Amino acid sequence: MSVSPATVTVMEVSPRDGLQNEDALLSTEQKLQLVQHALNAGCKRIEVTSFVHPKRVPQMADAEALCAALPARSDVRYTGLILNGRGYQRLRDTCLDEAGLVVPATDTFGQNNQGLSAVSYTHLRAHETRSY
């Protein structure tokens, strides 16, 4: 019995994860260029932004504008990261194909990233998710 998966899907995350901690704010156009480079390289799944409060992650303040400007591609799946129900509501109003949800594995990460322990965050998001 093989433990290897039949397929592996690679998701490009640089437009979101690669930019979220940068001090210099990139314009929406610069982010679109980064997405276009990923498309030109053959990426078929791209995490383009995060739907978080702009004060928490200023680099993602243009999430909706970025999504509205993405090139329509039937062969590509665009993803956005959410941390809570408000983020999901914002994502639903865009053209994105998927929502990614971070679930912290440790209390330290949970406190630093979401402001909750891993268990508290998981219970809260499970309850929220059932409502959708």
Locate each region found by the language model.
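Conserved small/polar residues in nucleotide/adenosyl-binding loops
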Residues: 122-129
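N-terminal glycine-rich anion-binding loops that anchor highly charged ligand groups
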Residues: 6-12, 31-47, 55
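N-terminal active-site wall of soluble small-molecule enzyme domains
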Residues: 50-72, 76-79, 83-90
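N-terminal small/glycine-rich loop or linker at the start of catalytic domains
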Residues: 2-23, 100-113
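Active-site mouth loops of central-metabolism enzymes
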Residues: 15-30, 78-84, 112-115
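Short, well-ordered coil/turn segments that N-cap beta-strands
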Residues: 8, 43-44, 74-78, 97
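Conserved, mostly hydrophobic/aromatic
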Residues: 18, 38, 91, 99
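Glycine-rich, proline-tolerant flexible connector loops at the mouths of alpha/beta enzymes
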Residues: 45-66, 104-116
